[in-house]
Amino acid sequence: MQEKVIDNVVLVLPGTVALSWLVMLVINGALGQGLVLRFKRNMRPNPDFAMLELPNWLSVLGAALLIGSIILPGSFGYFAKNAAFIMALPFFLVGLSVIHVAARRISAGMLLLILFYLLMLLFGWPAIFVAFFGLIEQRAGFRRKWASASKEE
């Protein structure tokens, strides 16, 4: 049992370490941006994270790595698995921006966001769905549709 757990962890350990480092980099960047904005020391305008978009080739690369992680054997599969793990972060961030835009559209949005983040912190697995939602958003464009619908109202 213990060996099986170790074998499974080893499969994604490099990707997990890199992803952890990148998440801390994003969090520290956002906190730093918030601080300089609060003290009015920012040299550039605050980015609109709600409208975060990724280049189209990133979707293709992410999908290819995901498929490769499933079907490729040996070292290539190991590389694809860890690279797909790392590539999930940009799509996770896009998925979060979609959730935030959707929460703005409803009256109890802040409460739902708090519950969602608690669920994600407690269980972790909702992050996978958020990343897939970000991948789908790249093609579907929910946020643009919602923004144009709210302008028409």
Over which residues does each language-model region extend?
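Membrane-interface interhelical loops and short interface/amphipathic helices
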Residues: 1-10
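Long, positively charged, glycine-interspersed low-complexity recognition regions
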Residues: 75-153
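Broad structural signal for hydrophobic residues in well-ordered alpha-helices, predominantly aliphatic
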Residues: 35, 67-68, 99, 118
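Small-residue-rich helix-loop
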Residues: 39-95
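Transmembrane alpha-helical segments in integral membrane proteins
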Residues: 13-40
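Select transmembrane alpha-helical segments in multipass membrane proteins
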Residues: 10-11, 62, 77, 113
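Hydrophobic, aromatic-rich alpha-helical transmembrane segments
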Residues: 10-18, 22, 78-82, 86
